[in-house]
């Protein structure tokens, strides 16, 4: 009986320790989190349209405990990204406000940067850093975010054919989440340059792994 009790107590201690370690390694997002950069995207530009892209945002958010309704910040030939994401304000994983409203988000006053553009897990993608800006040594640069949008949040001509193409037959407009570039003044978070294509092999050379922004509306 004593042996069984000690064994049960040991298991309890180990389980508690494991839970504590898990919590320490996987901190929960701030309750008001309503903005994040996707932590992954294995599909490139072929997201299954806006419905598929929204599903990616929703799935990633739910995996970290968010019950909000999430939308991808992506435009199509008939939809402007800025009309999809609600009215704000929006906060990142840490609870830091990145914009008060739509106008603020698409102005020079927004707070999206290498320090605030965090994933749903609170991690930072491989952004540029230093002076001059350079990617992490030996790692794939990830600062190009797919948006298919212009700086004002309206549709651009390049949207990976409305997010249904994942090869070199189409392109997407990209923004710099870290607000840095090799050229001075190139710092828009949602519209800097077009990709070489919509597959991973075309996205990676310019600094993308197909990541994009998600907002809770």
Describe the residue ranges of each PLM region.
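Secreted/extracellular ectodomain signature
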Residues: 22-217
């Amino acid at each position: 009986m004593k042996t069984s009790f000690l064994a049960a107590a040991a298991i309890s201690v180990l389980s508690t320790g494991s839970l504590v370690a898990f919590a320490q390694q996987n901190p929960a997002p701030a309750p008001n989190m309503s903005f994040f950069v996707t932590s992954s995207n294995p599909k490139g530009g072929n997201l299954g349209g806006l419905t598929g892209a929204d599903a990616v945002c929703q799935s990633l958010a739910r995996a970290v405990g968010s019950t909000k309704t999430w939308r991808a910040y992506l435009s199509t030939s008939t939809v402007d990204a800025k009309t999809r994401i609600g009215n704000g304000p929006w906060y990142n994983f840490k609870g830091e406000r990145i914009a008060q409203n739509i106008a603020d988000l698409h102005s020079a006053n927004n707070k999206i940067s290498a320090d605030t553009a965090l994933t749903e897990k609170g991690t930072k993608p491989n952004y540029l850093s230093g002076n001059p800006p350079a990617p992490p040594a030996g790692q794939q640069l990830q600062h190009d975010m797919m948006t298919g949008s212009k700086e004002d949040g309206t549709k651009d001509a390049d949207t990976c054919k409305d997010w249904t193409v994942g090869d070199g037959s189409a392109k997407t407009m990209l923004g710099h989440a870290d607000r840095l570039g090799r050229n001075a003044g190139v710092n828009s978070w949602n519209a800097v340059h077009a990709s070489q294509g919509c597959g991973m092999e075309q996205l990676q050379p310019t600094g993308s792994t197909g990541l994009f922004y998600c907002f809770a509306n």
